[in-house]
Amino acid sequence: MKYVGAHVSAAGGVENAPLAAARIRARAFALFTKNQRQWRAAPLKEESITAFKRNCADHGYRPDHILPHDSYLINLGHPEADNLKKSRTAFFDEMKRCEQLGLKFLNFHPGSHLGKISEDACLSRIAESVNMALDRTASVCAVIENTAGQGTNLGHRFEHLARVIDQVEDKTRVGVCLDTCHTFAAGYDLRTASTYEATLKAFDRVVGLKYLRAVHLNDSIKGLASRVDRHQSLGQGALGLDVFRRIMNDRRFENMPLILETKDATIWEQEIKLLYGMIKGAK
């Protein structure tokens, strides 16, 4: 079964995120468990945790179909010691919040070398950061998101993801979220049946489909190999609709969160309906 949703607002408290997801008829959702543009946040209140779990249960959202995303400020491969420590502290806090909410995943962007250290050194720091967070938590899986490769961000090559995973000690608690826009912008074509299959085979060969935990469903404003991260509504960008039709009919994407982060949140409900309508045999 396919579990499609969107990255919804948690304004007013995390307990509101499942309600926002239900309003757009989502079967999965993503959220920030704190303000994504601030380093610090007040601890989660017990009443918010209880209400979040109750609202998820009431609307049929299981933990494995919910994809929390960490703060955009965090850089787990930061070349400077003080900022690396700050990022690691914040990432650990995000992992703990996910545990408190009974969630299974934490989606994160790998990190950036900022032109100050080598790619290999940065990737090793990212893996070390993940290991430190996993050592201090019990159950949450660290889900690395592939990137478009904008600026000095790493994660745009499948080899980057593999190098991090290779250095993570607990392989049962690391996974990958593939973003269709990022994949395309990084130079992996998805537009035709043959290029779609070639890209997935490359991912399986280099990283392993066994590590795939989630997908971000986004069209791309920019073209193939642009290395620019600009999301577009489905079918309105350079990717087109065919890739999303293939994903919705591909058994490799069963039983995982398939999350919209498209440009216009006001049409997410229509996009979800569009995606489910793409399934062969759908009424």
Curated annotation (Swiss-Prot):
Binds 3 Zn(2+) ions. InterPro entries: AP_endonuc_2 (IPR001719), AP_endonuc_F2_Zn_BS (IPR018246), Xyl_isomerase-like_sf (IPR036237), Xyl_isomerase-like_TIM-brl (IPR013022). Zn(2+) 2 binds at residues 145, 179, 216, 261. It catalyses: Endonucleolytic cleavage to 5'-phosphooligonucleotide end-products. Zn(2+) 3 binds at residues 182, 229, 231. One of its GO terms (biological process) is base-excision repair. Signal peptide: none annotated. GO terms for molecular function: deoxyribonuclease IV (phage-T4-induced) activity; DNA binding; DNA-(apurinic or apyrimidinic site) endonuclease activity; phosphoric diester hydrolase activity; zinc ion binding. PROSITE patterns: AP_NUCLEASE_F2_1, AP_NUCLEASE_F2_2, AP_NUCLEASE_F2_3, AP_NUCLEASE_F2_4. Belongs to the AP endonuclease 2 family. NCBIfam families: nfo, PRK01060.1-4. Endonuclease IV plays a role in DNA repair. It cleaves phosphodiester bonds at apurinic or apyrimidinic (AP) sites, generating a 3'-hydroxyl group and a 5'-terminal sugar phosphate. This is Probable endonuclease 4. It comes from Desulfosudis oleivorans (strain DSM 6200 / JCM 39069 / Hxd3) (Desulfococcus oleovorans).
